[in-house]
């Protein structure tokens, strides 16, 4: 296995400016918000990895089981896959399962890992180093920038398979999901594939435990966003003055994560040139996790320029893997 990655000093400098600009913009909205991608610094990625191991958060285990069971069929249906692009690399364990279960049809391979977290990229590359005849290229950047980079590169022979797992599609609202899926489609040629993992609608009590676990790991993950603002942008958030809340919005079919102020307070964020007055109970909306029905997933993908090749559903744990091809 070989691993390649470009120097990211300028990328990180631009990312710091973008972080400050986004904090300035989103914290002045009504309701106050922060983009969920900023949850995933090194500590945030480690905390999310811990969340995925909790008994109440079944997405990771269910998806891994399904990838192992259906990986060979994914590659059989596409045929001649030479390049895999994983958007959101995680720890690499699920992609490793997919590639291993698809052997021997998937060698040699070039795998492009796209993630904003350098820690996640390093972890994923380490996991995938166990694979033979695989070259790994790291892209420490946003999904959109990574897709643009790949679209500008010469294409090798064979098909390209984009992989977007972990129900990360659920972090987009409907217009955002459509725009993102169309961006993926633009980076693919006719017949290339996209494998999408998406969580299905579940009972409210199951979702509540998944997003507000009794051990407080998800709460720490959410509050770490304030830790990051304090550290990187010169903020003075009092971490004990905000509490994690997870709310099931049935009308919108989404779980919402918020940070709620437990008392009135004024927060200064120097790098964002921002002073924010929080009243008791006022919330910062940090993440949405939309849940779907199987038919909604297919319709969403077809609207973005794909045709369904296969869909596998776990009816017990309520999760779907959908394989589509660019049309």
Regions found by a protein language model. Give the residues of each.
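A short, conserved alpha-helix within the catalytic core of class I
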Residues: 171-183
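Substrate-binding/catalytic lobe of Class I Rossmann-like enzymes that use SAM or dcSAM, i.e.
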Residues: 208-290, 294, 298-304
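Class I SAM-dependent methyltransferase Rossmann-like catalytic core
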Residues: 31-78
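Conserved class I S-adenosyl-L-methionine
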Residues: 81-90
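Conserved SAM-binding loop of SAM-dependent methyltransferases across substrates and taxa
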Residues: 91-106
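Conserved beta-strand signature within the Rossmann-like core of class I S-adenosyl-L-methionine
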Residues: 186-201
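N-terminal auxiliary segments of SAM/dcSAM-dependent transferases
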Residues: 1-38, 45
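Conserved SAM/SAH-binding beta-strand->alpha-helix loop
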Residues: 114-119
């Amino acid at each position: 296995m070989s691993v390649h990655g470009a120097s990211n000093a300028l990328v990180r400098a631009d990312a710091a400016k973008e972080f400050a600009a986004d904090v300035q913009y989103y914290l002045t909205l009504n309701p106050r918000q922060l983009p969920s991608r900023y949850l995933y610094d090194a500590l945030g990625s480690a905390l999310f990895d811990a969340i995925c191991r909790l008994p109440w958060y079944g997405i990771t285990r269910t998806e891994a089981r399904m990838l192992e069971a259906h990986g060979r069929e994914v590659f059989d249906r596409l045929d001649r896959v030479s390049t895999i692009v994983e958007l959101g690399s995680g720890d690499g364990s699920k992609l490793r399962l997919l590639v291993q279960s698809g052997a021997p049809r998937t060698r040699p391979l070039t795998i492009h890992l796209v993630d904003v977290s350098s820690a996640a990229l390093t972890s994923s590359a380490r996991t995938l180093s166990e694979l033979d005849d695989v070259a790994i290229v790291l892209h420490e950047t946003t999904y959109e920038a990574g897709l643009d980079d790949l679209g500008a590169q010469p294409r090798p022979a064979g098909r390209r398979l984009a992989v977007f797992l972990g129900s990360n599609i659920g972090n987009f609202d409907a217009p955002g999901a459509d725009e993102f899926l169309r961006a993926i489609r633009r980076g693919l040629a006719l017949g290339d594939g996209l494998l999408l993992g998406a969580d299905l609608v579940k009972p409210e009590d199951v979702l509540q435990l998944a997003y507000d676990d009794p051990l407080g790991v998800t709460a720490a993950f959410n509050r770490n966003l304030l830790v990051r603002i304090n550290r990187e942008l010169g903020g003075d958030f009092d971490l004990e003055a905000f509490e994690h809340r997870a709310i099931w919005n049935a009308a919108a079919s989404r779980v919402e994560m918020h940070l709620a102020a437990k008392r009135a307070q004024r927060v200064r964020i120097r790098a964002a040139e921002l002073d924010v007055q929080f009243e008791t109970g006022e919330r910062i909306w940090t993440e949405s996790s939309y849940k779907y029905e199987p038919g909604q997933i297919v319709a969403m993908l077809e609207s973005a320029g794909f045709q369904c090749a296969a869909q596998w559903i776990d009816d017990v744990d309520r999760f779907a893997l959908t394989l589509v091809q660019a049309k």
